[in-house]
Amino acid sequence: MDDRPAAATAASDRLARGPAGDRLADYARMLRRAGAIADDAGERAFATVPRHRFLTRFRHQRWHEMPCDGPVPEEILDAVYGDNPLAFKIDEDSGQLVSATTRPSLLARILGALELSPGMRVLEIGAGIGYNAALIQAVTGAEVVSLDVQPDVIADAEEALRRCGVDGVVTVVGDGYDGHPARGPYDRILASCGIRGVPPAWVEQLAPGGFVLAPFAHGGAHPLVRFRLERGRLRATGVGPWTDFMLAGGALYQPFLGAHPARFAAGPFPEPTLSRQAVAPMTGEDYGDLWFFLAARSTRVTQAHVGGIDPADA
């Protein structure tokens, strides 16, 4: 039996119709087989919310333009319904990446970590293309508030949501640091960007029993962390996986979040102190744990990658 609210069921069924319906079903099954989706509600959401309809232009190996009408080329559907993050906004002057979609398998794990159920109210910090909010709304059937500091991002997300017939998402232009108290309290607050600390406003806008889920940026690593208010104190629990989200802008941004802000000449470095110990090889996840541990204890910790040095010569 489908236990979604009627509004969510109708919206999802409407979104699923169309030539890409089989693609959506295969896409959802792929994510579930990979262990990224853990329950039927999540699989239904990914099988009914059309990711390609939220994109007008994206980069995967090269730039692609999404057709406004008519059939969508197979090459585009292959890119969109593979497990690929897709760049969709580049700074015209610098050529630097400004915005990109989340890798679907990571997004599915994040939605699972939210522990959503019908009727929950959710605040999303960082609107992206509107796809995340549409997935959340497909699961909860309740209002989702999606907030972003960039007016053009909100305008594009609004247009995509209208295009897909999603009417349960409220989009707001504003600084994520302040949250959005006007439509709170929220059962869940999701940050879709790397943050260094939890703003007090988010804690104040949580409903009883609610929590904040955010990629917590320390030492260049972004573990997914759940923050709950327990006995007047904020308790953090790592729920994984390690992520690589773009850092928040506006008041949420703090410099030195893990990488040196500018390129600098390598050396001369002071004479190192060497300690020779037999230790097991470290995986990428081990290094993430190490950098997070160090940076959580000192804001001075950063990373510098120095080329031309062979550890075997040390």
Locate the predicted segments by residue.
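Class I SAM-dependent transferase core
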Residues: 2-123, 132, 153, 167
